[in-house]
Amino acid sequence: MLGAAWNAAMQRLGRPLNGSLGVMAASTDMGNVTQRVPGLHPFVGITGAGGALHTREFATHAGSEQGYRLMDDAAIAMAWVIREVATTAESRAAILDRAAQLAQAMGGPTGERA
C-alpha cells in the first residue's frame, strides 16, 4: 500500500518506474522494523550508474546534479506519501489494518512468536 502510493508519487513527478516493482534483495534493518510498524524503504535508480552500490562510480553518479535532482524528487514523493497517510483516514486505516494482519500472521500483535 505504501509502495503503491510511492510509485504513484514518483510517476506524478515524471519519474518512470523502470525495472523491478517487486521485492528486491538487499541487506537493511527495515525488515526488522516493518515486523513491528508499517514502513517504506523505496529504491531509486540513478541513471548512468551501471556499477554496484558503494563504489566510486556509484558515488560519482549519486553526487552529480542529476543524482541530486533524483534525490529531491524522491524526498518530495516520500513527503507526499506521508501526507496522504497522515491526512486520509481511509489510507491510514487500510495500512494499519494490513500491518495488524501481518503481525498476527507472524505470531502476535508485535510479530513476536509465542
Task: Please identify what each model-predicted range represents.
Residues 101-109, 114:
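A domain-level signal for the structural core that forms small-molecule/cofactor-binding pockets
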Residues 1-48:
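Active-site-adjacent substrate-binding region
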Residues 48-104:
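His/Asp/Glu-rich mid-to-C-terminal helical/loop segments that flank catalytic regions of hydrolases
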